[in-house]
């Protein structure tokens, strides 16, 4: 005999996340390209997002309206211009997770091939570094005695809570005293980092299947590298390039020799 539905049951059903709605919004190829373009945390104009998605300005506006309505994307006005950014870092992490299970897009041009390779080499994961550059930076911090807690490897057969991508939970990295002194000398003001955000976090990198540095320190260190012009954005959103000064600085400061 079927059990009678109670008010508590209805509340539980009502509060279940509407995964299907979010998935349907992301499933559209044009909207997916726009969301990927926004995954580095920057606010981008509608015109650039239209070009990235390969659609007209009117079509892009309609897509962006749906994303704003669903609170996947936020809109900011600056004069007559409208800029869009992801509403939350969690959306970027969700896209990274989908990248693990999604089949690769067919490479139809040299540009597509170059972009895919560049993303694996060095990219942003919302506001911190990922790809081989991000993984290499974390490894250099560990080898230099700036970070402790784990060796940066991801072992799926031993993982308890860590998945193939996204924020990790199995290990507790921490800054050593050497790490604190080094970062302060480098221009990262640890005392002014937002208290609401974990100081140190890590993500499992979807392309490298190792850890890269996240959290307040990961974001602040990445911002400092851009401030020093050791890094610059590429022509495709999220792609990051190491400048000549950056190659020398990363090697001298952190013992990191990026292949870029």
PLM feature segments, named:
Residues 2-18, 40, 93-152, 185-220, ...:
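Amphipathic alpha-helical dimerization/coiled-coil segments
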Residues 68-78, 82-85, 150-151, 234-235:
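Beta-hairpin "wing" of winged helix-turn-helix
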Residues 17-56, 82-84, 124-125:
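N-terminal helix-turn-helix DNA-binding core of bacterial DNA-binding proteins
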Residues 78-101, 175-179, 246:
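Basic, amphipathic "hinge/linker" alpha-helix immediately C-terminal to the N-terminal HTH DNA-binding motif
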